[in-house]
Amino acid sequence: MGKAVSVTGGVVVLALAYVGSSWWLGQQAEKHYQTDYDKIVKRMGFDEVKRVVYTRGIFESQAIDILTLVLPRPPQGMMGDDDQDDSGEDITLHLYLVQTIKHGPFVGGRLAAARIETRLDKVEGIPEGLKQALAKASAPTASTLVGFDGSMDGQAVLPAGEMVPPDSEPDNRMSWKQLTYDYRVSGDRLQVQDQLQWPELTWSVSPGAFGTDKPGMHLVMSGLSVNIQQTGTNPDYCLMVPGHYTTRLNDFQLKTVWNDGKKPFTLFSVSGWESQGRITSSGELLASEENGAGKAVVMDVPLEKLGYTASISNIDEAVLVPLQDIIQEMGKATDPDDAMPDEARLRPVVSTLAASSPALAMRLDGTLKGKTAYVDSRVVLNPLQGSASVPLGQQMLQTLKADVKVYLPKAITAEVNRRLEKTFGKDANGCNLDCQLRQQGIALEQADAWKAKVQFSGGQLMLNGQRIF
């Protein structure tokens, strides 16, 4: 009898310990997750977050938040014939987000503090035309496992779906395959690993949709993958975080299409694209470099190679947080007149940024038949000069220095001329690309190429050695 009581008592104690630990772990997981949740919501630009329901249980809790987002209204008719409100008023959306927190220490067969399931329950305020267009689209979901140290390991999913504008041609549609986004974040929020996979996105617009006698459009993107690994120094940084990343894209095509049997014209396509980037920190200054390459078609001209390199240097870490806030607020502005912050707020950020002479360099090149065309540019913002009474924009123009070089082989312009004439016929004035470059006088003509050089320094603009202003 005594042994039975002892065993029973032990079971009760263990059960109470599990219940107590589950409740405590649930609270700890909620605390860590809520902090990150608030930061993410802020970075995404929501105007208001309101918690309307919170139910805490021993083994499971649930929260319902309303996220308010104000968006500018699209041009009239963009969302279907039934949505003809041309009042110009912004669209206010209310997103109902449901979060279910399943407390540890055992959740879904794994040892963890909690698992948090997040889903978008409904959205209020969507114009009727857009609501009909999204009838075959499903809301995104996310599942996050919270470790005992506050680390997070999860996956967000956008299910496959399509968007079809109401009362439109059957070919007017956007469709996509399931997008997955895997993330892993350390307890101190400094180590981050992200992976995005999007197998396919297609978007078709029938000829005539953009206007009478206007061609339609067909866009295809397939095999997009992005991998990011970051080792940060401050969990509040999101604009530039030390680490490295790779991007791969199997295929991207943008074409115009016609109803009269005319062959589709490729505006731009790229295949086998792969790029790598790295962000580094010296302790005070940040820098980044990126390069990518693939095969491409530009204006129906197939290139043997499309290359891209870019670098940013001398970014003072002290400006990251205020600069992030300014960029975020500019992105939220629905009126262009309200997008730029006032000078009193912007000046200290720009002054600190300019003090280290930040520089941006970029090069884009394409090769055809062994000949390479390129655009090569470099911009430097030197320390501001003069007193604070001088307008900030004027000070920046005086210290900004920019150089842009363009080189275009005639072997490439000849191929462009041939392709354009084959697709659209000869220009009414008989003036092809070379002729237009010659008439405009922007580029200098050489025996086998066109060249142009633009320089800006001390508030003066030079084109090919000649002062413009």
Describe the residue ranges of each PLM region.
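Short, low-complexity patches enriched in S/T/P/G
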Residues: M1-G2
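Glycine-rich, small/hydroxylated-residue low-complexity segments
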Residues: V5-G9, L16-F469
